[in-house]
């Protein structure tokens, strides 16, 4: 049976992650309050940020930037948007 949580991002009950997606306290916090769907949405956003900003994931500053963006996306005012990105129209 799937582990259900109240997703901090989606604001509803949803299937929780199978394991903490990141090490440390942030990973634990994500595991406890982020759904699989919200995590997949973040991975798409993260990929756009990496590509648009040409982040080198071997650079500790790039990794630190993404950790901050992850926390902002789920628990803050929202992560940075890729420049030039236009969300699809709802309808």
UniProtKB/Swiss-Prot annotation:
Transmembrane segments: none annotated. One of its GO terms (molecular function) is iron ion binding. Belongs to the Fe(2+)-trafficking protein family. GO terms for cellular component: cytosol. One of its GO terms (biological process) is cellular response to oxidative stress. It comes from Burkholderia pseudomallei (strain 1710b). It holds the Pfam family Iron_traffic. HAMAP family: Fe_traffic_YggX. This is Probable Fe(2+)-trafficking protein. Keywords: Iron. Could be a mediator in iron transactions between iron acquisition and iron-requiring processes, such as synthesis and/or repair of Fe-S clusters in biosynthetic enzymes.
């Amino acid at each position: 049976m799937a582990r259900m949580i109240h997703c901090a991002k989606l604001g509803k009950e949803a299937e929780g992650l199978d394991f903490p997606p990141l090490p440390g306290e942030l990973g634990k916090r994500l595991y406890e309050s982020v759904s699989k769907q919200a995590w997949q949405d973040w991975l798409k956003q993260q990929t756009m940020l990496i590509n648009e900003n040409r982040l080198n994931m071997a650079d500790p500053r790039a990794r630190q930037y993404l950790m901050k963006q992850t926390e902002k996306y789920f628990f803050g005012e929202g992560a940075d948007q890729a420049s030039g990105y236009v969300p699809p129209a709802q309808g």
